[in-house]
């Protein structure tokens, strides 16, 4: 049987909030089977829980937020959510003593290291996947995203930024997903932003944690970071990282083929909601026979060591 996963032990890290620029303490806690992914703000009294849920997602210029019925929000969840998807973590409590998850280096890699440091524990309960049964597509002008049936998890993402530094890079990336492929090829890709946008936001008291330490920063012509890019095509790889996190907002790994053109957080979420709203387009599946599990979701030995 393919089992649900949680952490072996509690781990903690500190970072900076993208919005406030203030120190944030992040605590990752194991959780029992069928808990799901729960984000928790401990800076509020009493603490407020935000279960990962496609319908709770709000996209802002800076990040993805989860918002509850009282309009309380937790921000910048997308990169940690991608790390959870990458390692197939089904049950976890994510605590922060702030309104946002720390931005770390702008990628998912620090969260992957933290999760691996905690260790991954298999629970004696079948892991549920969402399997795509019918093609579902959403569009917004010339942008689009779609899911098709496929016995695995594949991603094909194209961006189209009219910018010299981004034009010079490859703007399409394809991935046959696995935990190993995610860690090696996707997790280290950082978010990117324009210097003029960051300066404007900071002049208004926003994005106070934005810096060269947590993003690729570009001006009108080039990448400004002294160390340059981690990958030649880091821009499109990061958009794929975002999509992996966005699509895991249903709390389950998805079996299907994802293709997107110029998509972002909002359109990825719109696709996920469109799939879930169409009952005949998907189903929950479990795997009693390990041999029938798509290769995409075979646990790498290092994860369950």
Swiss-Prot record:
Zn(2+) binds at residues 79, 238, 242. Keywords: Hydrolase, Lipid A biosynthesis, Lipid biosynthesis, Lipid metabolism, Metal-binding, Zinc. GO terms for cellular component: membrane. SUPFAM superfamilies: Ribosomal protein S5 domain 2-like. GO terms for biological process: lipid A biosynthetic process. It catalyses: a UDP-3-O-[(3R)-3-hydroxyacyl]-N-acetyl-alpha-D-glucosamine + H2O = a UDP-3-O-[(3R)-3-hydroxyacyl]-alpha-D-glucosamine + acetate. Transmembrane segments: none annotated. Its EC number is 3.5.1.108. GO terms for molecular function: metal ion binding; UDP-3-O-acyl-N-acetylglucosamine deacetylase activity. It is an enzyme of class 3 (hydrolase). The active site is at residue 265. Pathway: Glycolipid biosynthesis; lipid IV(A) biosynthesis; lipid IV(A) from (3R)-3-hydroxytetradecanoyl-[acyl-carrier-protein] and UDP-N-acetyl-alpha-D-glucosamine: step 2/6. The keyword Lipid metabolism applies. It comes from the Bacteria. Its cofactor is Zn(2+). Catalyzes the hydrolysis of UDP-3-O-myristoyl-N-acetylglucosamine to form UDP-3-O-myristoylglucosamine and acetate, the committed step in lipid A biosynthesis. Belongs to the LpxC family. NCBIfam families: lpxC. This is UDP-3-O-acyl-N-acetylglucosamine deacetylase. It comes from Klebsiella pneumoniae (strain 342). The gene is lpxC.
């Amino acid at each position: 049987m393919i089992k649900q996963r949680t952490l072996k032990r509690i781990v903690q890290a500190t970072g900076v909030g993208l919005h406030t620029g203030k120190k944030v303490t992040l605590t990752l806690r194991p959780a029992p089977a069928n808990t799901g992914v729960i984000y928790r703000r401990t800076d509020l009294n009493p603490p407020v829980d935000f279960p990962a849920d496609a319908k709770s997602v709000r996209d802002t210029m800076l990040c993805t937020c989860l918002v509850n019925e009282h309009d309380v929000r937790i921000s910048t969840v997308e990169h940690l959510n991608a790390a959870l998807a990458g390692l197939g973590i089904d049950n976890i409590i994510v605590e922060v003593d702030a309104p946002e998850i720390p931005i770390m280096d702008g990628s998912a890699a620090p969260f992957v290291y933290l999760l691996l440091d905690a260790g991954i524990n298999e629970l004696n309960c079948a892991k549920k996947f969402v399997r795509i049964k019918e093609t579902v597509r959403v569009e917004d002008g010339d942008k689009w995203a779609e899911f098709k049936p496929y016995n695995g998890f594949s991603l094909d993402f194209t961006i189209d930024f009219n910018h010299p530094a981004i034009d010079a890079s490859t703007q399409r990336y394809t991935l046959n997903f696995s935990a190993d492929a995610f860690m090696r090829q996707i997790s280290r890709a950082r978010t990117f932003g324009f210097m003029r946008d960051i300066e404007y936001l900071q002049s208004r008291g926003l994005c106070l944690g934005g810096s060269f330490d947590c993003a690729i920063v570009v001006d009108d012509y080039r990448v400004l970071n002294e160390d340059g890019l981690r990958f030649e095509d880091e821009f499109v790889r990061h958009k794929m990282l975002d999509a992996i996190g966005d699509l895991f907002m249903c709390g389950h790994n998805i079996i299907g083929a994802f293709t997107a053109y110029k998509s972002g957080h909002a359109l990825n979420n719109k696709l996920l909601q469109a799939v879930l709203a169409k009952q005949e387009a998907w189903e929950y599946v479990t795997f009693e026979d390990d041999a029938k599990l798509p290769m995409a979701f075979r646990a790498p030995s290092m994860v369950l060591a």
